[in-house]
Every structure is written in structure tokens, then in C-alpha cells.
Amino acid sequence: MAEKIKVPAGVYDMVTRCMEQEFPDNVAIRYVAEDGKTVVEKHYREYARDIRKMVTYLKNEVPDLKGRSVVLLSRNCYEFCVASYGIILAGGVLVTLNQKKTWDELEYELGQVEPALILNDGVDYGCRAQLEAAYGPLLRPMNCYKDSTPGELTNCVDHDGLMMLMFTSGTTGRSKGVMLSERNMCSTLVTYSEVAENWITNRLPAGQKLPLSHMTLLPLFHMACFVCVMSYPPAGWALNLCGDIRDFYRDLGLMHSDVMASAPMLVETIYNDYKRGRVERLNGLWDLCCSSAALDPKMLEELAANGFVVNQCYGMTETFGDGILNFTQTADHMSAVGKPDDHCEYKLDETGEICIRGNSVMLGYYKDPKATAEVIDKDGWFHTGDLGRIDEDGYYYITGRKKNLMILANGENVSPEELEHKLAACPAVQECIVKEKSQKICAVVYCAEERQAEVKDFITECNRTLPLYKRISAVEFTAEPLPRNALGKLLRKEGRNLDAAKIKQL
């Protein structure tokens, strides 16, 4: 039986107890230095000391910081983690932004939060000139704290107040600032601590020693990665940072990792390595955690049968990453997102939409009470926008997005995700999106030009298995991959408006 992980009461407890008292000599963060060869290890003792330095720096720079926003605009790095804790413990509101967005998007988000400071890595991602022109006096380097003195910490965090803002990906329009509290974080930490205990008790390979190390290529500005920054100190585990997908195999080879949070496309890459007999490239990686999109259950089953542990999860920024987890390694439930945790309530409403109620649910959308009221009802249920079903064993399955439903002239509702899943079974289809066009169902397909006839034949056969109202009546072939966001999610609005290379009426 694994020793129970003591969940911290908040961010202050995380630093002063978990980092400084319980695990000071454990490695907290690893990364590969600029020479591309040297692995830098930061232990929890040094991590906590740097957090204290950041608190000192911020209080000196902005004496009236309480309740004001400090923005992080940077690739994955150790200083990002230090700043995240430092901003909160200095009384500020942590804001993490995607540094690779267009200036129009960044200008909007920065205008929303009105930052007191912007900590950034100095890299030009395409709009450096505009950033300096608009916010030059507020810009600071990520390591701005390095010459400061470690200061005293006080527990200044309002447990139910605004602790951080994280913007949604905005796949269908302007992004929204999700307001999150320390209570939201702690609710999620309860779940993640139980996940860690489950790993230790039921998933650990023979001979595997603790503490574990977790590789992340996901961006720290995204909740799927950020939640690891907050959930690993209570267990004393390490986070191995990779800042660029081009360095993934180099970094994985230099830093042994047990677990990896991954976008679906990277899981497929790892599967291909396994199929080609190149498992040595993975350097002992054995646990894959995936969210954001459905994966082929046959692929997951094969990975699980050959020594990998595969965990799927369903969480949202609006719930601090908390949600539904799937630890099963058997084929009958591999396509499910899992079962709900025990710390929130879950249900399907009358339309089949997944709803969540509990301490992990956000405070609301920043400066947008109308949008908040649209997703959190009077009884406190957060309406996720995802449609689902529950099987007889209590497993949840995602069937589509409510806002993506196509309403046809005959009144029938059709889920594009259902048809996309069927099209994905065609070997020639690399990517696809289904849309409504002139009251007909149309598929946009990315594939090799010489395989377009194969796709057409597949759709013809597929249509024979579908009711008339669900049949695909047009296909567009595009020469370019479909647009996706930083986490690999399909951008449907842009995908629907692609200029197709060819249009074939079936």
C-alpha cells in the first residue's frame, strides 16, 4: 500500500512544507542547457529559494501588487515555474499567455488583464516590435529575480478569490479568461494525489523506484501542463521540461522520464516507434497520459499489451484540469475517457451535455458575466459543451461538441465528430473535418492526391451503413494539413473555411 500523499492546504503550504520540509533534496525540475548536452537539475530546496527571491523582486518592483495581474509570456523553462509560484505568493494574479499567438490576439488578452508587469523570454515569436512598443516599460526577463534576496513568505492568498487567469484556446472565436482560485487548485490536487497513489500501488513496473519523473512537451501556459507544476510537489516528483518538439528525442534521451503528458499526435509517434522496434529512443518511458482528442482504441490496446500504461483524461481549464480519468488497460473500455473522480458531481443533462459541479469549477469568465451565466446555471452546474454517453459500467464517452452539431433542413441533428471518427478508419485519410455546406454534409479531407479515389470509394461504402440524413454527399480534398492550436486541437472555424484544392461531388 502506497503512503498517502498529504494534499497541501494551498500554495503557501506547497512551498513551505512540501518543498522546504518534506522533499528538499528531491529533484524538482530538469531541463537541458543551451549547449544541448548538459542536464540541469533544480532540487526543491533551490526551487523554493528562487520562489522566495521572486516574491522579493515583485514586491519591490510593484509595492501595490495585491490583486494585480502579472503576465508570463515564455516558452517552457524553469523560470516559468518559479514565477508561477512567486506571483501568487507576492499577492498578484498569475496570467499565463500563449506567446505564439498573433499580435491581434495578444493585444486583446493583454488589454483585458491590464498587467502590472510582463515577464518574458525575449524571443521574437512574430510580434516582438508591437509588444515592446505597447508595453516596453513593463517587460522584464524571466530570470529577473536572480539577484534578489530570498524573502519571508506570508500566506496572503484568498482561498476563494482570484488566484490566476488562463485563457481558453478560443477555437471558435475570441478567447475567454478563465478565473481560477486556490480552492479550485486544491480540489484538483486531491484528485491528482489519488492518481499518484494509484500509480504507485497498481501501475509501477517491477524494479521501478520512486520518485517518478514526468516529461512534458505540452506548453506551460496550458492547463494540461500547468497542473503538473502544481500537483508534483506534494509527491516530491520531478518535472522534466522540453521547450521545443524538435528537441523531444534529444531531451528524452538525456532525461529519463517515467511518465509523459502528451498531445494525441505525439502518442501516435511513440506508437510508431514501438512498431518499428525503436523503443530504445524512449529511454524507459512507460506511462502515457493523453487528453484533448480521442485515440484509436486498438493502438492503445496494443501499447498496453506491450508494457506501456496508457491513461486518458478529460479535464478543462474551467475545472483546473480536474475531470474524468481512464486507467483501464483492457480493450472493452479503451475508447472511453474514463470514470468521474469522487470529488465533484457529474451528470448528463437532457441534451446529453456533460455537466460538472464542485470545488474545481472556475469562478467564471473574466469581465464576462454573460458568458459565465451561459455555462454555469443557477444550481452551480458547469455545462462543458461536450456531449457524451455513459455505459452500463459507468464509463463516460465523448460523442461530440454541442456547438458543433449540424442542424439540417429536415430538422435532424448530426454530430460531425461521429462521421469524422468513421472517416479516420480509412487508411488513406490523414486528417478530416466534417461540415454542413448548402444543407448537405461535406467532408474536408487531407490526403495524398493519388489516394483521393480510395477515399471516395471508402465514403461510398461508409454511406451504405448510415441513415440517409447522415450520409456524406460531398468531399473536398485539401493539399494542406488542417489547422490546429498549440495542443493539437482542430480549429474547426478555420478548417471549415479552407480553400479546397479540389471538390468532388459524390
Per-range role (PLM):
Residues C186-S213, L220-G284:
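Conserved AMP-binding/adenylation subdomain of ANL enzymes
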Residues E41-R45, M163-V190:
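Conserved AMP-binding A3 loop
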Residues P24-V27, T149-F167, G173-R174, R203-S213:
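Conserved pre-ATP/AMP-binding loop-to-beta segment of ANL
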Residues I118, G358, L363-G364, L387-K470, ...:
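AMP-binding/adenylate-forming catalytic core of the ANL superfamily
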Residues L252, D258-S262, Y271-D332, E345, ...:
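Gly/Ser/Thr-rich phosphate-binding loop
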Residues M1-E61, K66, Y85, G111, ...:
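N-lobe entry segment of adenylate-forming
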Residues V40, V55-K101:
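Conserved AMP-binding/adenylate-forming
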Residues K339-D342, D349-V375, Y395, N410-V414:
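Conserved ATP/PPi-binding loop(s) of AMP-dependent carboxylate-activating enzymes
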